[in-house]
Design a protein with these regions (language model features):
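Active-site-adjacent segment of FAD-dependent monooxygenases/related oxidoreductases
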Residues: 2-73
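Conserved FAD-binding catalytic core of PHBH/FMO-like flavoproteins
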Residues: 9, 77, 121-243
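A conserved short coil-to-beta-strand element within the FAD-binding core of flavoproteins
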Residues: 88-102
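Core beta-strand elements of the Rossmann-like FAD/NAD(P) dinucleotide-binding domain
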Residues: 112-120
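Conserved small/polar residues in nucleotide/adenosyl-binding loops
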Residues: 296-303
Length: 303
């Protein structure tokens, strides 16, 4: 949130408007299902009095929960309002670097025509399957595909099961929860208390399951513990748990950041938080280089 504050107090304030505030983030709750036995709770998100005091003393910003579906439009709008020429439905294909800058070849997916974009630098923040990092030949260490997971995004009113014990994360221990994925079933609150994301694992040594409406509904009902639950299924997807990072972040005038360079589960605040910090670190350095105020810094991940 300090990074958003640096973009402008209005940006930080708008993020708070869309976010779930700290008090509603609650505690980590462990259970056999939302309806079933509660196994325990763990204070988190700065809820312990000592942690809250430490946070208040160390930062003017407040902890909150803001899903990417709300954060990304805010950042996109802010960039456009400040003169950025932003394009949607555009796919990076390749680039060529020269002494003056970088020429990127992209595909306009609306017209199916290739276009050239000229820039002084190129930043590849294109996710865990980064084409920019691949074309750069960045060296990576670690392993991809160490576990299999599925995401099930749905709407359902679960207030009668959770409003009295608010939380962002409800960890569900059921038979099969230790197979693949993140080691447990997860019911993740997106909007209190009617929009949810379920994370469930599958055996990475087997083909990814076909997560159709019937399968997704069964998983959701099992983890909630209500076999008559009416849900509005919004989306389903499968993904792999990775454990890999780039040993170099850049080459020449081309840089990579975010999931393009470190591919790991988003647990413990290692999701958008790390990517935002990557972007902020790179942005201020490039800005000062362009102003002639900063010389080259090492491309290692620690910088």
């Amino acid at each position: 949130m300090e990074v958003l504050r640096d973009l402008g107090k209005n940006v930080e304030n708008e993020a708070y408007l869309h976010a779930t505030e700290q008090d509603l983030m609650g505690e980590n709750i462990f259970c056999t299902s939302l309806v079933g036995e509660e196994l325990g709770r763990m204070k988190s998100w700065g809820k312990h009095p000592n942690s809250r005091a430490e946070h208040l003393l160390s930062s003017p910003s407040f902890m909150n929960d803001l899903p990417q579906t709300f954060m990304e439009p805010l950042l996109f709008k802010t960039a456009c309002s400040r003169g950025t020429n932003a394009r949607m439905s555009t796919q990076y294909l390749s680039h060529e670097e020269d002494s003056e800058g970088v020429t990127s070849t992209c595909l306009d997916k609306l017209t199916n025509k290739e276009i050239k974009i000229r820039s002084k630098y190129l930043v590849g923040a294109d996710g865990g399957n980064s084409k920019v990092a691949e074309n750069l030949g960045l060296p990576f260490e670690g392993k991809m595909g160490v576990g299999g997971s599925m995401n099930i995004l749905f709407r359902a009113d679960l207030s009668k099961y959770v409003a009295h014990r608010p939380s962002v994360l409800y960890w569900v221990l059921q038979p099969g929860a230790d197979i693949g994925g993140i080691g447990m079933g997860l019911v993740r609150m997106i909007r209190p208390w009617n929009e949810w994301l379920i994370v469930w694992g599958y055996d990475i040594n087997q083909p990814a399951p076909e997560v159709d409406e019937k399968f997704a509904t069964k998983v959701a009902r099992d983890l909630v513990g209500d076999q008559k639950l009416n849900i509005e299924l919004l989306s389903v997807s499968t993904w792999t748990v990775n454990n890999m990072y780039a040993k170099k972040m850049s080459k020449g005038k081309v840089f990579c950041a975010g999931d393009a360079t470190h591919r790991h589960p988003p647990s413990n605040g290692l999701g958008s938080n790390t990517s935002i910090q990557d972007g902020f670190n790179l942005a201020w350095k490039l800005a000062y280089v362009l102003k002639g105020c900063l010389l080259y810094t090492s491309p290692s991940p620690r910088d």
